Amino acid sequence: MSEMNLCRRNLLKAGAAAAAGIMASAAANAGIPAAKVEKYDEEYDVVIIGSGFAGMACALKAGRAGKKVLMLEKMPVVGGNSAICGGNVACPVNPVQKAQGIKDSRELFIADCLKDGLGLNHVELLSKIVDRCNDTIKFVEDCGAEFVPNHMLFEGGHSVPRSYEIKAGTGSGYIHPMYDQIKKLSNVTVKTRAKFDDFILDGDAVVGVTYREGYRFNAKLQSDDLENKTGKTKTVRAKLGVMLAAGGFSRDIWFRQIQDPRVVPTTDSTNQLGATAGVLVKSLGIGAAPVQLCWLQFLPYTNPREKGFGVSVNFTNHACMDFGIVVDRKTGKRFMDEHACLLYTSDAADE
């Protein structure tokens, strides 16, 4: 290995170590004692951090229940990564399957998940998906989401076709109609360019948050969470609770490499640029216990010549993987089970 490559590797290691140290410090200092807050700028029943699928659903449910809700989104538009994802949703034992004679069951779905998840799944949560997925489909349809009619996708890792395909082709097919419903609720306030900074604690209880209004995300910074100081700080009291729906950290070059050293800073991502670990780090600092953070998901369908998700995925995923074969262009030989789970197909593509 050349001296230049060694120097570059050492520099990346040093940078990651420094960032890890800063993040550890941020986590250790997470949480502001409520006694130090002289006066709250705002007061709501529920404060939601993030505006993707989870945040939107929470805002709608709480808002329709008559609660006063504040939803904070750090980016200039709502939706987060949910707005640009593929939008397909697996729902075992659904009416479309029944009409088409597709035999599915709770046991088969859980077995598929356990196989793909290497047995690390929380089975009680898988059961909850089976119990509630049809309610979820009805919920988003009632909001105005439209699925491809009478159609089930047969996606990798599943034993039978069980996934609904959104007509819009992306998660925007859910986000837009859900947001339209939220805008009808006068008791729900949505703020964009509003970045969560910290929790306000009364003992072990989260009673509010601080955030910055007028924040401007800066993709040119190595770590926007650590370096960006834009915006005016506000304090908000949450009388009933704070909902964390800030999404993943696929664009956080330091945090993701700490979890999986293979994901170097030059590794591209299909996620929107604001998918960083700032909220997660603060949550860890006050004792949150997320599970299996190091199990990152790779997507084997994308084109390295395209930025992010690209458009080639529409062919590779829905045509090649479903109806064709994948071959090594150097040997012309097939080298994977095209219908296997993402973990298997991603590892096969990387070899």
Where are these regions (language model features)?
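A short, basic/flexible loop-to-alpha-helix module at the beginning of a structural domain
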Residues: 31-42
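N-terminal secretory signal peptides and thylakoid transit peptides that target proteins
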Residues: 2-18
